[in-house]
């Protein structure tokens, strides 16, 4: 190496370790429209100032490392570094802070949720200077959103495909989730669809096990779909779970579903991964398939209040990666979901523009620039007595999914489906007539049960069933 080269490489470089906040804490920074903005809940280790903790998050999730390196001089850190531009204490929590970080758009590959998360929620979550770290929200700039296809079809196109308007869609997860033969599984699908449901569903862990191989299941479910359509005159569907051990196998299953004429397939997007999910979403758009998304594994990531990632971030990522439905909690059922927080990310899934609203956990205004919306799916421990609340909470653009609440009917699967359809139609009619579903819900169901023996039987079975536990996910 020549002396001249040595001089150039060493200009401005001083080996050693320096505080992150000297480079990455920039409270004077004015965010750009093209920045990805993140709100982190930071719990520093004792003795670590919040500014240093916030700067460490910005550094370790962008250009920084634990020591000064001479190759910093070969690029422009001011152009590429993440910046912690704000710190605020969390009300009611000791030693917790919201750190706001801005990332230049050039740090991220176009159209890749995988790359975005690898940076923002990568190694930094194991950083020793932090006791805990949670990503509460992201603002995705419109310039980045435009690099994503998003949902294969979206809410309006799905309604047009199904020719169903003015009410929530009804679904059912086939139970028991594991152990049925393909023929008996298909029989249950047929009975539920014939009884009045729009969709039935594979459970998240129904893939291709020894008791029921995927191809057999697809064939019997397709038979059930077409038979129930012929009898009812309505378009029906079954979420055929294409999730598999490899992307190649997943695509093979999706292709077979299309060849059978199935209208919709399904993917477990967190266990399957964002790369696989985006690939499947692209195939579904190109081939006219709807895509149902299950969020299995989400609670491992989002349930702890001070560490991990809030589901609203996973919901935004899914809208970018692609899916026409996603499970979003119920508020009233057996699974976690506080009302205002749930409605916050439901709006982020469906609406084109969502204003900042800290009372619902929304830290940033989000403009989706006409990216198609996603139908939220309410599923888990719900039954006919929940129908008024679900209709009032989620509105028409949703899927209400009753597994045990259909298949647990004392008269069988088809009467269980009838009970749910009657309850839904009664609630929609009452709402359209101006009645208050929140206040008059039980009375509306009781009135409908007088002329529907199937609904009356369901009301009797589940009149005492409640899931009253305190929500973990609060503001």
From Swiss-Prot:
Q: Site annotation (Transition state stabilizer): which residues?
A: 334
Assembly = Heterohexadecamer of 8 large chains and 8 small chains; disulfide-linked. The disulfide link is formed within the large subunit homodimers.
Q: What does this protein do?
A: RuBisCO catalyzes two reactions: the carboxylation of D-ribulose 1,5-bisphosphate, the primary event in carbon dioxide fixation, as well as the oxidative fragmentation of the pentose substrate in the photorespiration process. Both reactions occur simultaneously and in competition at the same active site.
Q: Does the keyword Disulfide bond apply?
A: yes
Q: Where in the cell is it found?
A: Plastid, Chloroplast
Q: Which residues form the propeptide?
A: 1-2
Q: Which residues bind Mg(2+)?
A: 201, 203-204
Q: Which family does it belong to?
A: Belongs to the RuBisCO large chain family. Type I subfamily.
User: N6-carboxylysine: which positions carry it?
Assistant: 201
N-acetylproline carried by residues: 3
Extra info from the record?
The basic functional RuBisCO is composed of a large chain homodimer in a 'head-to-tail' conformation. In form I RuBisCO this homodimer is arranged in a barrel-like tetramer with the small subunits forming a tetrameric 'cap' on each end of the 'barrel'.
**What cofactor does this chain's UniProt record say it requires?**
Mg(2+)
| A biological process term (GO) from this entry | reductive pentose-phosphate cycle
Q: What is its EC number?
A: 4.1.1.39
**Cofactor note as given:** Binds 1 Mg(2+) ion per subunit.
From the Swiss-Prot or TrEMBL record, give the protein name: Ribulose bisphosphate carboxylase large chain
**Organism expressing this protein natively:** Cucumis sativus
Which top EC class is named for this enzyme in its record? lyase
The main location class comes to plastid
């Amino acid at each position: 190496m020549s002396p001249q080269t040595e001089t150039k490489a060493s200009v401005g470089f001083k080996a050693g370790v320096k505080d992150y906040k000297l480079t990455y804490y920039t409270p004077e920074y004015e965010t750009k429209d093209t920045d990805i903005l993140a709100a982190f809940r930071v719990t520093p280790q004792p003795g670590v100032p919040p500014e240093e903790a916030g700067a460490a998050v910005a550094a370790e999730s962008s250009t920084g490392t634990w020591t000064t390196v001479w190759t910093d001089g070969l690029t422009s850190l001011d152009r590429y570094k993440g910046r912690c531009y704000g710190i605020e204490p969390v009300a009611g929590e000791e030693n917790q802070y919201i750190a706001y970080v801005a990332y230049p758009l050039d740090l991220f590959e176009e159209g890749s949720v995988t790359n975005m998360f690898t940076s923002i929620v990568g190694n930094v979550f194991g950083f020793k200077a932090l006791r805990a770290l949670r990503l509460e929200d992201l603002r995705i700039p419109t310039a980045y959103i435009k690099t994503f296809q998003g949902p294969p079809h979206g809410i309006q196109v799905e309604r047009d495909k199904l020719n169903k308007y003015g009410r929530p869609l009804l679904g059912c997860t086939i139970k028991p989730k594991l152990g049925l033969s393909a023929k008996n599984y298909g029989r249950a699908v047929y009975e539920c669809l014939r009884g009045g449901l729009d969709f039935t569903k594979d459970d998240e862990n129904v893939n291709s096990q020894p008791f029921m191989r995927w191809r057999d299941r697809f064939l019997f479910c397709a038979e059930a779909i077409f038979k129930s359509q012929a009898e009812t005159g309505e378009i029906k569907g079954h979420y055929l779970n294409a999730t598999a051990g490899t992307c190649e196998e997943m695509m093979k299953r999706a292709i077979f579903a299309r060849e059978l004429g199935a209208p919709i397939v399904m993917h477990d997007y967190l266990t399957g991964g964002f790369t696989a999910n985006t690939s499947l979403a692209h195939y579904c758009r190109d081939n006219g398939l709807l895509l149902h998304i299950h969020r299995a594994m989400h609670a491992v990531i989002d349930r702890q209040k001070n560490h991990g990632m809030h589901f609203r971030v996973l919901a935004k990522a899914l809208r970018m990666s692609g899916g026409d439905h996603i499970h979003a909690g119920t508020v009233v059922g057996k699974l976690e979901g506080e009302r205002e927080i749930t409605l916050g990310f439901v709006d982020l899934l469906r609406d084109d523009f969502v204003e900042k609203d800290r009372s619902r956990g929304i830290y940033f205004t989000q403009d989706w620039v006409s990216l198609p919306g996603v139908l939220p799916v309410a599923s888990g421990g719900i039954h006919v007595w929940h129908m008024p609340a679900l209709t009032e909470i989620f509105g028409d653009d949703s899927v209400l999914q009753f597994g045990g609440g259909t298949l647990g009917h004392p008269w069988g699967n088809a009467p269980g489906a009838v009970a749910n359809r009657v309850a839904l139609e009664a609630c929609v009619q009452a709402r359209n007539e101006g009645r208050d579903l929140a206040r008059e819900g039980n009375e509306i169901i009781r009135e409908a049960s007088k002329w529907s023996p199937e609904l009356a039987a369901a009301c009797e079975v589940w009149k005492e069933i409640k899931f009253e536990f305190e929500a973990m996910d609060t503001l």
